[in-house]
Design a protein with these regions (language model features):
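Residue-level signature of catalytic and energy-coupling elements of molecular machines
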Residues: 12, 62, 118, 165-166
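Conserved structured catalytic cores and adjacent interaction surfaces
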Residues: 102-165
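Conserved small/polar residues in nucleotide/adenosyl-binding loops
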Residues: 1-5, 165-167
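Hydrophobic core positions in small helical hairpin nucleic-acid-binding modules
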Residues: 3-106
């Protein structure tokens, strides 16, 4: 198993790169870009995983999708990547909001989900071990709401949620 970096852009492009693409630089140097921005596109999510991990992707509509990490095409840092809609049966109007790498779907780990409307849900990670190819509804949303945040949690973890109220 090889350690990889998986990157998702704001416009829905996904790519996998070896960790060796990101080597340490000396002090005072400019560093290296993780990707070339294509106009308005920016990096949305950047995670580390192994090739045999399962990537669980969550959409703004509350649907989860599973994709083996090795199925994400490996690219160079300069490459744009592959559109998620070419890898999974995701409707074009649906956007991926979270990407979780999973090595093992254990019963002692939970997923904590938060919606734009302030609803929170905790579900066992093992409930996502058999996601169908067309996805699995992770959370039912009210009209106008969207799934915005999903993280792994184990017993004893705390979640602090802040909200900005515009007056």
């Amino acid at each position: 198993m090889y350690k990889r970096q998986v990157l998702l852009t704001e416009t829905g492009y996904l790519k996998r790169m070896p960790v060796s693409e990101f080597e340490a630089t000396s002090r005072g140097t400019r560093g290296k870009a993780g990707t070339r921005s294509q106009g308005e596109d920016a990096v949305k999510l950047f995670i580390s995983c192994n090739d045999h991990d399962t990537l669980v992707l969550f959409s703004d509509r509350g649907v989860s999708y599973a994709l083996p990490a090795y199925r994400v095409p490996q690219c160079s840092r300069a490459a744009k990547g592959t559109p998620v809609v070419q890898l999974l049966p995701i409707p074009r109007e649906e956007a991926i909001t979270t990407l979780i790498p999973v090595s093992e779907f254990s019963d002692d780990t939970d997923l904590v989900m938060l919606t734009r409307g302030g609803f929170i849900k905790r579900t066992r990670l093992s409930a996502f071990s058999n996601i169908r190819s067309n996805g699995l509804i992770a959370i039912n949303l009210e009209e106008g709401d969207a799934l915005t945040w999903v993280r792994l949690a184990v017993p004893g973890d705390s979640v602090l949620i802040l909200s900005l109220i515009h007056i």
